[in-house]
Amino acid sequence: MSRKRYIVSFLITTGATCGLYAQQQTVVDNRGKAVSVMIPTASETMAGYVDVDYLDDKFYNSSIQTGFGNTPSTNATEPENSMEIIDRKMRNLSEMMTMTCNEEVKKYIDRYTKAGRQSTCYLLGRARYYNPIFEEALRFYGLPLELKYLPVIESGLNPNATSRVGAAGLWQFMATTGKQYDLQIDSYIDERRDPEKSSYAAARMLSDLYKQFGDWTLALAAYNCGPGRVNSAITKAGGGADFWAVYQHLPKETRGYVPAFIAANYVMNYYADYNITPLSTGLPNRCDTVIVEKDVTLAKVANVLGMNVDDLKTLNPQYRQGLIKAFATNGVAKLRLPSEMIEKYKKYKEQIYQNETTNEEPNMTIAATHISQKGILY
């Protein structure tokens, strides 16, 4: 988004040479297996770049189980990866967006697949949950589905990611921009963190930017630094058909933004070439949405359904105080639940709405627990 400068996880701006701060996580999954893994967190690596606060560590750093039941290899495999071969594969990724490989893009591919490969494993796992949400919004506006990888570089696929300048959510909306695109932000709800609503808002904004610039690389640059700066870069360049034509006149962080996006598209599709496999994140395989008819706390819902309240908050990060105000939201209030909980919710709906509290401990956990200490990933 515009008006913010930061990096997420393993992304380093072009020219940065310092290591990424990370947490060494001792992860305990639901089977009781403990393994130490390095999970990068955003850190200040250059003057002007600020970190992102990852607040849902439970899910972001949860299980080390891969989709195949094995811990992924930590050794990068070197496939046949000349720029010509990568460029040929990249051109097969999209019919609507032009993506090519050059030295800048290759730098980010290397970072995703080498120093940042553990982060890539987690991002692949989280993408299985979030991509269907993104794709639905992108299809609604007739946009390239490849844009679903934009939150990879915006937020590390973390709806609770918050930049120091106040950008929030998967798509990193500033409050003013979020309200411009009809996202409700108040003391009870922040729809910038709502995966579904923020995705529709982001798709609408990207559609507007593409209509303005007529090129997806320029639209992406404008999403990062704002249309004004892109127009200024075009003027300084004496006109420009795409991002690469105005590259030298863009802000430093934006020069790395589009190459990082292109690299993310490539790696998220060809990760197997680098011996990278998705990690299970503890997020449910499928979710559905129910309408909330009365004010209710997430703690009450979790207690009646036998869920862990932190799991429920992770699926519904937009509710700032853990309280759903049924008639205080735009449209109707919604609650996202694992699909297997929908019928149970309907069955016990009246009990959920009863004005009573309980101290009973929830008895189901869908994510692992962890302990951590600071470490460094190079």
Describe every region a protein language model picked out.
Residues 9-17:
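Bacterial N-terminal signal peptides
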Residues 6, 19-141:
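An acidic, Gly/Ser/Thr/Pro-rich helix-cap/linker signature
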Residues 113-124, 134-136, 140, 159-167, ...:
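Second-shell loop/turn segments in exported
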